[in-house]
């Protein structure tokens, strides 16, 4: 039975407007049902003494929900918070403390750090120091099974949080916020990080906590900055969300990457000491480089524009290498079963798969001899992409989505397998989950890579790999080291979770006569003709 999610509210600077906040919470709960907790970041109290607070402190008024707040961010409100360990301020209102971890009975783990950054000695009561951040990091990250935390609460924003993300509006994230909090976020990997103080609402695109293809997939982080309560501009100050504690989640579900996930904005900050040193701003780089964090030794930089940046005397793309012997897939080879060919372009051709999973299972193949996508010249890649897009439109018109995979292992000529899956069979997420689940069962590390990534930035020519591309553009990649199951892609697609034809997992069990193959090829050519871009030339 699935774990029931917790329903939480997070709030920005209250600044003494307790009635406004709690009346709003009552309205929300009346409309949407009760929430489990309210988490307040930023300035909970206003600078002046407020009779409104006395009503709550004496019990004349009561918060309608269990509320947890951070400590002071200035001297004026420090007197409301006695001690570093936290305490009850009023019924249903609890001060968490200077720093620490709050773990609820559900297993939800909330890390909190009160105050603003300070390098002064002694550290003011309303501030935190590099030592505070270091002790928090050590306390949590020293555990051998540490994967991250559910929620991080801080009052200041982390510095550079806007890098690689959507616009943060009027807040310049390169010049505001705390570098110490940035480094803490790198270490703690919170699933949600809430902050305030800037009187602005900013929900950043989620960012990843791992380097693609260099580290195992990890959960993404969502950073949300909230405005001040009752602000005249009506900026969002209250954020509702549901969450299942990560300790209760299946790994595949936890590490599932949102479609709009970005690079980690603080990726240089993890290298900083736990001091108040400046974290250098991430350099402007091409998308492919920051997705994979490649050094010059590991991969080539792609130009950041679409223009050809080769020098005037640069070498022209080399011709494809000649096969060492007879090749079943070079179109000029006498070994090719030409009756299976259904379309021929300038650099590539389409052929029905021999022993296909379905009658319209096709292959995209280069006419010349290339072993893998990584080795293709630019003009061949362009036509491969054209075929992929055309096949997607073709299959969509027939009520199907297509899955594409390549296995560059124990093969001599590139074969891009394109398998249509009826829309009625399953959703794209089901296909993705099936690949991930079956990969885990076979100890295959299948990693998600960015949608617009270039395989050439991931694998070097000659490297063995397997990759899957879904109709949404999502891609899964495995770097093959040894003993990869040759039929893995077919086995997943033939499984009960997708096409439900497990008996067809091995192509050799699906072969038909040449007459039948010729009939299928004729039918495909006829059906595909309205989509055939080669006729436009």
Swiss-Prot record:
Stretch list, region Disordered: 297-323
Residues that span the membrane, as ranges: none
CDD domains to which the protein is assigned, alphabetical: MPP_CWF19_N
Protein family per UniProt: Belongs to the CWF19 family.
Protein name: CWF19-like protein 1
Organism: Mus musculus (Mouse)
Lineage of source species: Eukaryota, Metazoa, Chordata, Craniata, Vertebrata
Gene: Cwf19l1
